[in-house]
Design a protein with these regions (language model features):
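Short, Lys/Arg-rich, polar N-terminal cytosolic tail immediately upstream
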Residues: 1-18
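Interfacial segments of alpha-helical transmembrane regions
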Residues: 15-27, 67-90, 159-160
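Immediate flanking context of iron-sulfur cluster ligation sites
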Residues: 29-46, 65-68, 125
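C-terminal TM-helix exit segments that contain a strictly Trp-centered aromatic cap at the helix terminus
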Residues: 31-40, 88-103, 120
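Non-cytosolic membrane-interface motifs at loop->transmembrane helix junctions
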Residues: 45-55, 108-111
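Membrane-interface loop-to-helix entry segments
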Residues: 50-60, 142-155
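Extracytosolic (periplasmic/ER-lumenal) interhelical loops and adjacent juxtamembrane/interface segments
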Residues: 101-147
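Membrane-interface capping segments at transmembrane-helix boundaries
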Residues: 163-169
């Protein structure tokens, strides 16, 4: 007769929760970046300056989460740093959604990252680049812009990741 392990009312062991938090800290920013790049490449939705800021925070979270898998002795600290980066992206997304709604004033300058070209090449690139304003919604689902969705998903995920990482029992 086969025996089964006793069913426990407890949630997963702390180590298992930390591994789950680690996985979420990797999957959430990767999925959000995939969605952002997918909408850019296939949907023609080019990012504004604040969209890039949100992406940079997710770019920071991914290597932290990967490093946490490689260094299990430092996992909790690395996962919490990844959660912080995800929360920063969410906070920027919340601010960006507020700019889109007219609640906050947006940035007033635009920047260019072009280097190593002649003045004529730079002018040609500037004129060919799509002009994307931070205060205009390019796409929305149920009245919530992409920046708003990033805020909702990122802040929620950061909270869950932090809770899973810090919960001892």
């Amino acid at each position: 007769m086969a025996t089964t392990a006793p069913v426990s009312d407890e949630y997963a062991a702390p180590r298992d929760r930390l591994v789950l938090a680690n996985a979420l800290a990797l999957i959430v920013p990767a999925a959000l970046l995939a969605g952002a790049y997918g909408s850019q490449i296939w949907g023609g939705l080019y990012p504004c300056e604040m969209c890039w800021w949100q992406r940079y925070a997710h770019f920071a979270a991914i290597p932290l989460a990967l490093l946490a898998f490689v260094l299990p002795g430092r996992r909790r600290a690395l996962v919490l740093m990844a959660a912080l980066a995800i929360a920063v992206s969410g906070a920027i997304g919340g601010y960006h959604a507020g700019v889109e709604a007219g609640v906050f004033e947006g940035i007033t300058t635009c920047t260019s990252t072009a280097t190593g070209a002649t003045n004529a090449d730079l002018l040609k690139a500037i004129l060919a680049a799509p002009m994307v304003r931070c205060d205009q919604v390019q796409w929305a689902l149920w009245g919530i812009s992409m920046a708003g969705w990033n805020a909702i998903v990122s802040l929620s995920a950061a909270g869950v990741i932090a809770w899973l990482s810090l919960k001892r029992r």
